[in-house]
Amino acid sequence: MSSREITILKIQEPTRSIASLTRIMEEELSQYRKTLPKGFREEVDCDEDTVLFLHVDFLPLDFQKTTELLLTGKKDLVPVVAIDLQGQILMQAFGNEESQTLSLKTGYAHYFSRSRNQLWKKGDTSGHTQKILQILSPTDRSFLVYQVEQEVAACHEGYYSCFFRERMEGVTWKLLPVPRNFLPEKS
């Protein structure tokens, strides 16, 4: 198994408010689960590189609106969580200085793809854009939250949110009631 870093979001239920964001190595995930309170739920994104742990005991973070860049170095990346107006978590990606600048300037979400090593505007090819309503940051300024108006779907699998399944005991998946707005074309 290749070692990769994954993003962990603790989410307060039932409000689905973000309580924390941290990055760990994938092989540390089973040990991380052992530190969580009994009765947590686990939702996983389509690429299996971001995990939401949901529990009533997680305390939500305080967020403030921001119009400033979090990064000023060309090589730095900051986690960015996209949510809709109701607070539903749509996806998690990364931003660099250029993507943040374009997001602020255009009002549409731009990200930096680590796998392609390039800047991208969400929806540039699909038309499934994210119009930014506001940009939030926790008081420690460790990541950004783009509250967006999502066109069609955030997930390349056709789901409104990338978090459309819950991991059950072991490796069993349960589909969540997340609308699937299109079927992706097979290549």
UniProtKB/Swiss-Prot annotation:
EC number: 3.5.4.19
KW 4Fe-4S (keyword) present: no
InterPro entries documented for this protein: PRib_AMP_CycHydrolase_dom, PRib_AMP_CycHydrolase_sf
Keywords linked to the UniProt accession: Amino-acid biosynthesis, Cytoplasm, Histidine biosynthesis, Hydrolase
Localisation: Cytoplasm
Biochemical pathway: Amino-acid biosynthesis; L-histidine biosynthesis; L-histidine from 5-phospho-alpha-D-ribose 1-diphosphate: step 3/9
Pfam families, A to Z: PRA-CH (PF01502)
Subunit note: Homodimer.
Family: Belongs to the PRA-CH family.
Function: Catalyzes the hydrolysis of the adenine ring of phosphoribosyl-AMP.
Protein name: Phosphoribosyl-AMP cyclohydrolase
